[in-house]
Amino acid sequence: MTPGGDLLRKSLIASERDEATRTAWRVRTSPVDPARFVWVDETGSHVALTPTHARAPRGERAAGRVPRNRGRITTLIAALTVDGMGPALLLEGGVDTDAFVAYVTGLLAPSLRSGQIVVLDNLAAHHAARVRSAIERQGAEAWFLPAYSPDLTPIEEAFSKLKALLRRAGARTRDALADAIRPALRAITPADALGWYAHCGYPPPGQLL
């Protein structure tokens, strides 16, 4: 105990975060039926993922084996709705504008319904004119999150569960990693999605924050 209270681990947030913009986002989204939102983002994986916790006899350290060579990153582009995970695309390496446009035009846009709102962060590839036009041709809209606000998108929590499942799978080849990602995506349920929506401030009608 310190004179000013307990000594706790700090929760760090980006100093560039603009609270006025975040408040405006809350005002904009609060009247919207959460079922209209389609959250789209990317996450990276590799062939050296391993569980971060393990059991060991009392007084001994838990140890595990993991490859030091992670290989090239595998990127997953995916969407989350109240029904769970939507269209997904696996890429070798990172995401550039052409890759993201290919995902949107080939997978995401055909799945959209008129009136849906695709929510994206501010990655440069997300702002490509071809992305917005493909979304709007389906009668949907593209909205962009406030900068430095991963806490406002429930797909971040979906990716957290996905990574936990991949750590448990322990894939050590690219093919094994791809094979592990598919069932991990299916393991994300509508109940998961609704919980994450509510946690991020988008509760379904009738559910209080």
Positions of PLM-derived features:
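Short functional hotspots at interaction and active-site rims
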Residues: 1-209
